[in-house]
């Protein structure tokens, strides 16, 4: 395959260490703009510009399109570092970057249409559930639907939308992922939320639009072996790792960074505080030390846990292996349990802020809101994600068309 003629910035020479350094360098800048993102209910232009200039939307985009094509552990690490500055920024980058990796499943024609003129082009999504409905027409499908939680849609020229294809009798005959240009969908300004406001995760809709076959990829019934045309174009085993089993790890990265920010801010606050009556240093209280220690241990444990999942999966695919059902369910279990521990850590730290933490201008208040809002994501539901792994461990059988 010939490399496309890339006119925007080319980040193919940026390695893992440099990419992580770029993300780390943005932390102070992101903290300065976090409140602005929160109020705008989307990333402000200055933040989007900085991310583009540093190539941080493109850390797992193929090198042939000017992306960094980093190892899969970056799937967690880059959002984690950005999340230390602002959870919403880390979350949006995690989502939009993951769609760069996902586009590699589509045929070359689709990749050329989206990235041919501008590899910086971003793709948002409505894929958590197949909320669209489609019928077969000549050359493609006719798609109608309404998809919620499309993070970063304000900055994206395309949408990746999931749908169920039905026959004339209404019977499901396929499940497809569709790449849809901005001109064919409508964004509803409905993102008024408790937290994660800066993600701008709005609802998108479309009515009876035509999606050609080359942009409507079969994910299940018509493609039981999950043999995707785009994988023939990209040799890196990272692109073969199934998103369904590790999809939550990138956004969990952002929220691990958010919890780390809570730890850092609380630690700095404790070093400076003393009691009003006795002047005793807050840092000398053993109860305070215990809380800091417990929160830090939980955050470090989750970081190690989820990074190890990413490393393990990539190492397996490097040698031509594939994930077992047990491994896929274990990764999903780890992601959900990890978020539970992160919420506990942030709660512990927020309690230490006392009355000062309840003000709108308190970074800890936003961090607290963001952590709890993010925990509502289906990937982090312990009820949904822990029991399937246990079911298999106990000798049961777990079936899912999308896993």
Q: Where are these predicted regions, by residue range?
A:
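Basic/polar N-terminal segments that are highly enriched at the extreme N-terminus
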Residues: 1-21, 25, 402-403
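Generic structural signal for well-ordered, non-transmembrane alpha-helical segments
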Residues: 24, 257, 293-300, 332, ...
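C-terminal helix-coil-helix/basic helical segment that borders enzyme active sites and/or dimer interfaces
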Residues: 31, 35-38, 301-337, 350-358
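Glycine-rich flavin
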Residues: 43-53, 57-157, 171-173
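DPxDG-like acidic metal-binding loop motif
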Residues: 146-185, 189-190
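Glycine-rich beta->alpha junctions and the first turn(s) of the following alpha-helix
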Residues: 194-195, 201-299
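Short segments within alpha-helical structural elements
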Residues: 344-351, 382-386
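Glycine-rich phosphate/cofactor-binding loops in nucleotide/flavin-utilizing enzymes
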Residues: 355-403
């Amino acid at each position: 395959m010939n490399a496309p003629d890339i006119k925007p910035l080319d980040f193919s020479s940026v390695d893992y260490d440099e990419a992580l350094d770029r993300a780390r360098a943005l932390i102070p800048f992101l903290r300065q703009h976090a409140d602005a993102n929160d109020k705008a209910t989307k990333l402000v232009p200055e933040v989007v510009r900085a991310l583009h200039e540093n190539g941080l939307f493109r850390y797992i985009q193929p090198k042939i399109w000017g992306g960094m094509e980093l190892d899969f552990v970056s799937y967690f690490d880059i959002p984690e570092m950005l999340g230390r500055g602002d959870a919403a920024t880390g979350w949006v980058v995690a989502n939009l970057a993951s769609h760069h990796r996902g586009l590699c499943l589509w045929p070359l024609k689709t990749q050329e249409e989206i990235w041919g003129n501008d590899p910086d082009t971003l793709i948002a999504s409505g894929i958590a559930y197949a909320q669209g409905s489609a019928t077969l027409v000549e050359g493609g499908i006719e798609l109608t639907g309404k998809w919620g939680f499309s993070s970063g849609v304000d900055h994206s020229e395309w949408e990746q939308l999931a749908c169920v294809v039905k026959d004339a009798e209404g019977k499901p005959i396929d499940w497809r992922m569709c790449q849809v240009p901005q001109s064919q969908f409508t964004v509803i300004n409905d993102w008024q939320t408790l937290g994660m406001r800066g993600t701008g995760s709005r609802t998108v809709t479309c009515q009876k639009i035509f999606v050609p076959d080359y942009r409507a990829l079969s994910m299940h019934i018509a493609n039981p072996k999950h043999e995707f045309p785009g994988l023939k174009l990209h040799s890196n085993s990272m692109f073969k790792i199934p998103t369904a089993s590790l999809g939550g790890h990138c956004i969990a990265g952002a929220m691990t960074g958010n919890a780390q920010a809570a730890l850092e801010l609380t630690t700095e606050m404790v070093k400076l505080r003393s009691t009003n009556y006795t002047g005793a240093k807050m840092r000398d209280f053993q109860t305070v030390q215990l809380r800091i220690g417990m929160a830090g241990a939980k955050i470090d444990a989750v970081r190690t846990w989820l990074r190890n999942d990413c490393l393990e999966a990539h190492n397996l695919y490097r040698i031509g292996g594939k994930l077992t059902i047990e491994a896929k369910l274990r990764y999903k279990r780890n992601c959900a349990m990890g978020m539970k521990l992160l919420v506990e850590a942030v709660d512990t730290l927020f309690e230490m802020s006392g009355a000062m933490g309840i003000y709108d201008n308190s970074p800890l208040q936003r961090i607290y809101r963001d952590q709890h809002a993010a925990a509502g994501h289906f990937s982090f539901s312990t009820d949904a994600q822990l029991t399937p792994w246990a079911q298999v461990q106990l000798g049961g059988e777990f079936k899912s068309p999308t896993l």
